[in-house]
Amino acid sequence: MTFSHRPVMPAEVLEYLSPRPGGVYVDGTLGGAGHARLILEATSPDGMLIGFDRDPAALEVARERLALFGERFRPVPGNFSEMGRVLAELGVDGVDGFLLDVGVSSHQLDTAERGFSFLTDAPLDMRMNTLVPGTAADLVNDLNEHELARIIKEYGEERWARRIASFIVKARVDGPIERTLQLVDIIKGAIPRGAWEERIHPATRTFQALRIAVNDELGSLERGLESALGLLRPGGRGVVISFHSLEDRIVKTMFRRYAQGCTCPKELPRCVCGGVPRLRILTGRPVVAGDVEVAENPRARSAKLRAAEKL
């Protein structure tokens, strides 16, 4: 299977994750297994990597590409949000590090029939796990106008959300919206031509919103990150790469909450909550890809890396 995927910020991931031989690590989003290979190489000869992916195609590719590492690699079909349960079933009670490279993969975008791209005609699908029900077409055709507008506004940060939702509801009266380019045409008609942005396709934000909703991406990130931080051993590190502000905000907020410690009101003379910091944040500001990497891999342009260490 042809599966093109170039790992984002590979050197930075290794720097902040700091994998070592004998350690137990989790890659919550295997994708093309680029990061996973680097972690397995860095933890040779006896480190273990548990890798998650809910995309059956990605998991198959990861198994093939990482077969040479034998039992040091444990592939898991499913969402990294289920990390706590899965690791307990594997008898793993703690990890030395984890990586979450969230969002849609290059392969998913480039595979037209998956329906993630607004540039090619395909079924309006957008499921990362094609074995479960619930496609983007289901949302577009079944949700009421208010709920559609909410999703597009909240997950896509689209200023024209209400107008787009209205146009979608009117268009589906003539028949179901089942193709990506059908939806693109509706979105283009909803956004006034003078409001189109020079470097951003008019459908970008709506497609992002539907993809996030179909795959519960933000909920998965919150649950998975909470679970991963709970499993992290003292001195262990967590690295998260996100690709838009909604994801980055979740990571930043959770890292800060774990690093805060005391949550007592400032007016109290002493701490009564007993809270202590559980994390040390390693990245005051998110790390971004360098110019050379962005030139070679445009997907890296919007990537933001945050890292923290368990206390």
UniProtKB/Swiss-Prot annotation:
Record EC number: 2.1.1.199
Keywords assigned by UniProt, alphabetized: Cytoplasm, Methyltransferase, rRNA processing, S-adenosyl-L-methionine, Transferase
Location of the protein in the cell: Cytoplasm
GO biological process: rRNA base methylation
Top EC category: transferase
Annotated positions binding S-adenosyl-L-methionine: 33-35, 53, 80, 101, 108
InterPro entries according to UniProt: RsmH, SAM-dep_MeTrfase_MraW_recog, SAM-dependent_MTases_sf
An annotated GO cellular component: cytoplasm
Entry annotated with the keyword NAD: no
GO MF annotations in UniProt: rRNA (cytosine-N4-)-methyltransferase activity
Catalytic activity: cytidine(1402) in 16S rRNA + S-adenosyl-L-methionine = N(4)-methylcytidine(1402) in 16S rRNA + S-adenosyl-L-homocysteine + H(+)
Keyword S-adenosyl-L-methionine: yes
A Pfam family annotated for this UniProt entry: Methyltransf_5
HAMAP family: 16SrRNA_methyltr_H (MF_01007)
Family that this chain belongs to: Belongs to the methyltransferase superfamily. RsmH family.
NCBIfam families (alphabetical): 16S rRNA (cytosine(1402)-N(4))-methyltransferase RsmH
Function according to Swiss-Prot or TrEMBL: Specifically methylates the N4 position of cytidine in position 1402 (C1402) of 16S rRNA.
Protein name, entry field: Ribosomal RNA small subunit methyltransferase H
Gene: rsmH
